A protein has these predicted regions:
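Structural/interface elements that position substrates and couple domains in central-metabolism enzymes
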Residues: 1-281
Length: 281
């Protein structure tokens, strides 16, 4: 069940995996899920260890795709390739598909980080090393700092007293969950570098205040966040951030620098309006 879509996911699941120990348990669970599973092939029965492994392996596979694409995006930037075209090209391959191929500033939340760690720890207890998943974790932790690194490079290593606007605090849209959110890493690094931060998120403001208190300023809306800002960092791709009024930003920002952590903006369009634009890849 995805945060923000749990009810819909329950009513219309892709598949339901059930671990059972007896035929009686299977019959009971089959009867329970039948109204929601008109296509019986989406109801999968297996033993309990396999059911647990399916859950952890599925989320770890998705996390792997994200970290892989972030690695590819960073390489694209170095060799002059367009990561969006690369994403479309490999996503058009029916063996791969287009989902979870979007580069960004790292994944967070309660599921992906936890499940990747769980498989790594389970393997260690069994005397095995999950080398791929360890790399997935390493790439993701590094990726959470990528907007900071780009900003630091833009200002030649000096962010002291820079006014930085953050759009998005939650780890993804449609939730206030900030567990393992990239915004937390960004905030820590920006404060350590001496920058001032003003942040806005449609619903995660209270959660952010609970977590970090008054270490940053909190905006009343997305445009208040960018008032007199030296740079804007897009961290969470909320719908309301997708089509801002760039004319307002151009008039209210001190220095029109935009760092797009989710690659949702048109760089050519922004550069045509005299913005300095950075994306992932």
């Amino acid at each position: 069940l995805k945060e923000g879509d749990a009810v819909d996911d329950f009513m219309k699941p892709d598949r339901v995996v059930v671990g059972v120990e007896s035929e009686k348990a299977k019959i009971i669970m089959e009867r329970l899920y039948k109204p929601f599973m008109m296509n019986n092939y989406r109801l999968i029965f297996t033993d309990i260890p396999s059911a647990e492994m399916i859950k952890y392996a599925a989320n770890s596979m998705l996390a792997t795709r994200i970290s892989f694409m972030n690695d590819i995006a960073n390489l694209c930037e170095l060799v002059g390739a367009d990561v969006n075209m690369v994403r479309k090209g490999i996503g058009a391959d029916s063996r791969i598909g287009s989902k979870f191929l979007y580069p960004g500033c790292g994944y967070g939340g309660s599921c992906f980080p936890k499940d990747v760690k769980a498989l790594i720890k389970t393997a260690e207890k069994s005397g095995y090393s999950m080398r791929v998943l360890k790399a997935v974790e390493e790439v993701n932790e590094s990726q959470k700092s990528i907007l900071f690194e780009k900003l630091l490079k833009h200002y030649n290593g000096d962010l002291k007293d820079k006014q930085i606007a953050l759009w998005g605090l939650a780890f993804k849209p449609e939730t206030d969950d900030m567990r393992e959110a990239p915004s937390l890493v960004l905030i820590d690094k920006l404060i350590e570098a001496g920058a001032n931060i003003k942040a806005y998120d449609p619903i995660a403001m209270d959660e952010c205040k609970r977590r970090i208190g008054d270490r940053i300023a909190y905006a009343t809306d997305m445009y208040d966040a960018v008032l007199d800002a030296d740079a804007l960092l897009l961290v969470t791709e909320w719908k309301e951030f997708r089509m801002p009024s760039w004319s307002i930003l151009g008039k209210t920002m001190k220095d029109c620098v935009v760092l797009d952590g989710r690659n949702i903006y048109n760089g050519e369009e922004l550069r045509g309006m005299d913005f300095i634009y950075y994306k992932i890849g």
